[in-house]
Amino acid sequence: MIDSTAVAAGHAKQPFYKHLYFQVLVAIIAGIALGHFYPTFGEQLKPLGDGFIRLVKMIIAPVIFLTVATGIAGMNDMKKVGRVAGKAMIYFLVFSTLALIVGLIVANTVQPGAGMNIDPATLDAKAVATYADKAHEQTITGFLMNIIPTTIVGAFASGDILQVLFFSVLFGIALGIVGEKGKPVTDFMHAMMYPIFKLVAILMKAAPIGAFGAMAFTIGKYGISSVTNLAMLIGTFYITSALFVFVVLGAVCRYNGFSIVALIRYIKEELLLVLGTSSSEAALPGLMSKMEKAGCKRSVVGLVIPTGYSFNLDGTNIYMTLAALFIAQATGIHLSFGEQILLLLVAMLSSKGAAGITGAGFITLAATLSVVPSVPVAGMALILGIDRFMSECRALTNFVGNAVATIVVARWEGELDQEQLARVLSGKEEFTSIADVDALPASVQPAE
């Protein structure tokens, strides 16, 4: 084991410009400036962002497999697996529904689309046809069946998080059941965690480059001026998401003995990475490592975080109901209380059916509107141009929601070291980055 005091002391001497969060922040600002002043060149930098995200996705499957399988194999009671999963799903259902309700309430109160008086017949339905077609392809049954991989290799080859998680849980249970006979396999997997997380640390060094390219492309392609036309909707969504994080999730954090502000400060590097790349998957390995370092047992971290990436989408849920009512208001369509409840129920189901798909937020909205006849699907053309600017906020809110969920479920299950959590969140035991190799062994230390 590494002396955490010595590690923290080493961090204190590190210049601020060597911290990953500072490098990513500078890269984001530079990307915005380049995209604004040289938009054509900025658009050409898209491969930098895409390449970095692909690099991270490359190692997500082994990180999940090793974390989940070793965590479950180390459980003395296999019933804990079902109990942790059950508590996590209850938490996800409650807060996903709450996020949808918050979106409805804010949309009815602020009415960001009121007064636009847009004729639905003048909207270009072709612009959103691709999203609508993808939405129709998704069903709850199809989604559930897709969790089961056709082959083990196929799950890892496709990088499907839920398929990898499904196999990892079953494999971990099998390892736990065979006991001592499976110990060589468990020891090998523990040993494999060191080079895998070392690889994660190496890849994270490229995070500023990825964030720079992704932000330069976004601003270069869509332009800052495109935001001003629908600033009311964007502002309403950002403020609502911030209130949800600091008020709703903040209250949950206080009830469970920690501060939402301290938690956000602890995961600031991952949040900046999500902001820069618009992909919460890019920060998944870092979040898993930090949650374990914060005192959550590996078995809980391995189950809650990957599952939450598909089922605990607070930001996406706020966006769905808020955007749906915005379209209705902008096109002069009045939705009754009953129609809004229908919208809420459909959104609850469709958000699960479209989980894990690229552009899931927009596709889920298309799926919801296609079932609710009162609101025209073509109305999505109104927000197509600014959706990219709202995707960052969706991803950030989803990310914070999953961090909170992990700690809360770990505490419910009695699998949280609260003293360790307090030390880490107070800064007494610093863990600055997944890219900080010195800190990694403590978070992947084999179970005694």
Swiss-Prot record:
It is found in: Cell inner membrane. It is a multi-pass membrane protein. Signal peptide: none annotated. GO terms for biological process: L-aspartate transmembrane transport. GO terms for cellular component: plasma membrane. Gene3D superfamilies: Sodium:dicarboxylate symporter. GO terms for molecular function: fumarate transmembrane transporter activity; malate:proton symporter activity; succinate transmembrane transporter activity. SUPFAM superfamilies: Proton glutamate symport protein. The keyword Magnesium does not apply. InterPro entries: C4_dicarb_transport (IPR023954), Na-dicarboxylate_symporter (IPR001991), Na-dicarboxylate_symporter_CS (IPR018107), Na:dicarbo_symporter_sf (IPR036458). Keywords: Cell inner membrane, Cell membrane, Membrane, Symport, Transmembrane, Transmembrane helix, Transport. The keyword Cell membrane applies. The chain crosses the membrane at residues 20-38, 53-75, 88-110, 161-178, 199-220, 230-252, 325-347, 362-384. HAMAP family: C4_dicarb_transport. Belongs to the dicarboxylate/amino acid:cation symporter (DAACS) (TC 2.A.23) family. This is C4-dicarboxylate transport protein. The lineage of its organism: Bacteria, Pseudomonadati, Pseudomonadota, Alphaproteobacteria, Hyphomicrobiales.
